[in-house]
Amino acid sequence: MTELFTLKESVLFYLDRSGGLQKLVDDCKLLNDPQQVDAVYRFKISVNPSDLIELDPVLGHCVLHDPLRATVLFQSVCFLAIKTLSLTEKIQTASQVNVTLIFTNLPPFPEYTLDLCSFPRVYGPMRPVSMEGVVIAMTRITKYTQGARFLCTNDDCPCSTGFHHIRVHAPGATESATVRNDFICMICSSQLKEDVKFRVLGDKQLVELIHVEALDVLRGHRHGSFRYQSVTLFLRDELCNSVRIGRLYKVIGIPALVHQWPNMTWSVEANSIQLWEPKDCPEVSPRFQQLLNWTASSPWRFSAIVAHCFGLDLAPPALYNTLKLGLLLSLVQTRTDADDSFHSLDVLVVTSDALILDRLMTFSLSLARRGIRHQASGEMFTSLSRDEHGAGTANIHAGSALLATGGICMLGDLGCYKKDKLDHIQSVLESHSVSVFIPGKKYGEDADQQLSFPVQCSFWGLTHSSQCSGRTDSAVLGTAELGPIPAQFAEAFGLVIQCGDRVGEQAVHAQSVHTLQQAMQPGTQPYPSHWEFSTQDYKELVAHCQNLQVELSPEAEKLIHGYYMASRRARTQSQGVKISLASIKLLLSLAEAHCKLCLRTRVLEEDAVVAVLLCENSVTLKHGASALIIPPDAVFPCDMGDMEGLQRRDMILDELHQNILRFIYTYAPGADTYIAEE
């Protein structure tokens, strides 16, 4: 008895010191509405286990290892405070006080952490644990009984009136544990009957969580044998709609075995949820630091060498430099800001040889923080099933695009997709959201419902180009053959890169020699170079670049704005093509990404030049050449295997820079007022 009194005294002292007592007073003021009379009143109390242990170790141990008993202690103290301070007349018994303890954190020890990869999961003490995982499925919000009032059927029993028999939901309890018709009065043993008009309902949502490493299997390759299994979270009341499919969360919850005869399900009652993103910002490797110092005299050389040396195990140098640069820019630019705004850069590759490029894109996918390789036979966005935990509502499962949230979704060969699937992908590319239709009759609802989910990933696609008779290679690249995909689809993609059609037999021979060398001497470096970088070096570089915060210089902004206006007018006059506002976003994304890849924090005019060249090549592939005459591989116009080649490339890019300025002055009158002539 003395120990119980001491614990309650510690609870009262903690509530007073932490502000919980004042919050109780404020919450009770909201209950004084005479129109609202309930059987149970819910109070949320935030508890910090570290502070509790410091105040009273016994109470801290009770909260961490026996939360149900701790809840009863807080309930008793809260009821005593309500009656002593006369906070409300609506609460007559302690049973009407429904206290929910919200954990702010847990001690950073293994016994308070649940690894979602650990097996088997057996019944243990119902105490809070912390876990991290990705949301892969969620249900619609349904109702559950938060609390109910029962009256004794014996009129002579004092429990036939008042609020003596109150049942509230407890973690791990089913609906039948809270409300059913076989409860017995504690005083006279007569049957109890629910007073339905006092039933209090709350919101409930089921969510499936899985270890983030499980998504590595979907990159297209896997190492070792692992077993991954999702865990079901029960979200209640204010936690409903607090998560999004595809996002990574840190959850504090209480594991429980839910009995639904004849089955028994292991699940977790969520207590608190917070968005969790690993804040890793690795340093750039010494090799890249050395390269950065060596190329400091030119704003273009660092990114050129980084792209040139990328993926040498899969393709010989100089063969797909533009594509490799585009993939690196997409990796760097794909990120979510602190304000939850998402930045993406979609890449569509047009080629006549898809095998090598598919391998190169798959290898690039391994550098992404999260990368999903979609199978044409699988679900791209969402799928529906019936919930298996008794709710009977629709369970929405994430497809490849939603699982790739914050990363890259690789579509592979678009020739494998049917027209309706391509139309759906095009719609998502344009709106960055996907709608899910839920038929009400099928899933136990009165009305149909349509939900919308944001799609926050970059898409990589591949299409075979058709060979046109009579077509010859020239310095000016015309409209590309996009194979089975419509022109509107390519327009929605943004950046389009053509590979393989102009390099001819020489490139085929180089690729064949490279493949044979790698097969006969795997792991060796077939092209000795002063600059050699490992896959880990590239992973660290991409991760570091993603975290860089950049600002747009006035010179870069003016060049981008001037090119957009000039290109829009030139193409409208000569081709009747209207350049959309999406081109501005593409130009800014390319310029920012190139700035980051060069490890700068200020977007220079030279970054804007690279963005303009890539964008102009992309628009040319879709709509044909314009008055701005640039070579097909404008960013890599010459071989750069040595210092002389790098210098020659700088000179060509300087000339192209001047061509862009002349194009702007010609087709955007007035541009000379804000762009300084060089």
Give the location of each predicted region:
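Long, intrinsically disordered, Lys/Arg- and Ser/Thr/Pro-rich regulatory tracts
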Residues: 1-40, 345, 358, 382, ...
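Short hinge/gating elements
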Residues: 115, 166-175, 183, 192, ...
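C-terminal engagement/docking regions of AAA+ P-loop ATPases
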Residues: 560, 569-585, 596-678
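Conserved AAA+ ATPase small/helical "lid" subdomain
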Residues: 313-318, 456-458, 489-501, 505-587, ...
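OB-fold/S1-family single-stranded nucleic acid-binding modules
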Residues: 149-151, 248, 252-294
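Conserved ASCE/P-loop NTPase catalytic core
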Residues: 128, 132-134, 139-141, 145, ...
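Long, low-complexity, serine/threonine- and charged-residue-rich intrinsically disordered N-terminal tails
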Residues: 1-231, 235-247, 252, 257-264, ...
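Active-site-adjacent bridging/hinge elements
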Residues: 102-106, 222-228, 296-306, 556-568
